[in-house]
């Protein structure tokens, strides 16, 4: 859950930074993508080593498609870059500075709360999946429902077709929109 919370926190920062630097409407596609105009703009990977009651480390790797103008055919329909969306090359240093500034501003809130509760409202405001029909590709039991938001520890809350609420852990599934990538 810590890795999920940390990743969610980093995504919120990326989205805030890109929005500040360029004024574009970037959104979070839970659990590990940031999207712009319905296409993937950023990706994140997390790795954690832990023991019972002790975390050795959490490593977060993130990437933003900044000035890429072409994508391989197999992802061309679902991927984009800032340069494509803006119509011109983008200053990478400006993006990095804005992302780091946004990260720093909210880092203390995250540490104080120990989870995403202090950031949950702002996170959900940029959550592309919120109130949208989704297909949860859980290998044990795939299902469809409506994404409601996240928990204070980063799980996606989904109202299933039978009315029950499922809390989906990021390491378990892939979430897709019913009608598109988002």
Question: Where do the PLM segments sit?
Answer:
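Single conserved hydrophobic/aromatic residue that forms the stacking wall/gate
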Residues: 1-7, 11
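PP2C/PPM family metal-dependent serine/threonine protein phosphatase catalytic domain
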Residues: 75-85, 170-178
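Acidic (Asp/Glu) carboxylate-rich active-site/surface patches
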Residues: 12-53, 63
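Conserved beta-strand residues within beta-sheet cores
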Residues: 31, 41-45, 120, 131-133, ...
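Conserved, helical-rich catalytic subdomain that frames metal- and/or nucleotide-binding sites
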Residues: 85-140, 178-182
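Conserved RNA-binding domains used in RNP assembly and mRNA/RNA metabolism
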Residues: 130-182
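Short, acidic (Asp/Glu-rich) active-site segment that either coordinates a divalent metal cofactor
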Residues: 53-83
């Amino acid at each position: 859950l810590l890795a999920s919370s940390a990743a969610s926190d980093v995504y919120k920062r990326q989205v805030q930074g890109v929005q500040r630097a360029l004024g574009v409407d970037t959104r979070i596609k839970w659990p590990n993508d940031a999207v712009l105009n319905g296409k993937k703009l950023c990706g994140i990977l997390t790795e954690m080593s832990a023991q019972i009651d002790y975390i050795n480390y959490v490593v977060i790797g993130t990437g933003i498609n900044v000035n890429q103008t072409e994508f391989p055919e197999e992802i061309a329909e679902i991927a984009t870059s800032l340069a494509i969306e803006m119509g011109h090359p983008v200053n990478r240093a400006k993006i990095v500075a804005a992302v780091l500034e946004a990260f720093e501003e909210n880092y203390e809130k995250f540490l104080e709360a120990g989870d995403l509760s202090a950031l949950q409202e702002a996170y959900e405001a940029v959550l592309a999946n919120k109130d949208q029909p989704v297909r949860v590709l859980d290998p044990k039991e795939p299902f469809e429902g409506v994404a409601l938001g996240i928990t204070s520890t980063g799980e996606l809350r989904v109202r299933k077709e039978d009315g029950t609420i499922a809390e989906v852990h990021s390491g378990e599934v892939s979430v897709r929109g019913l009608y598109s990538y988002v």
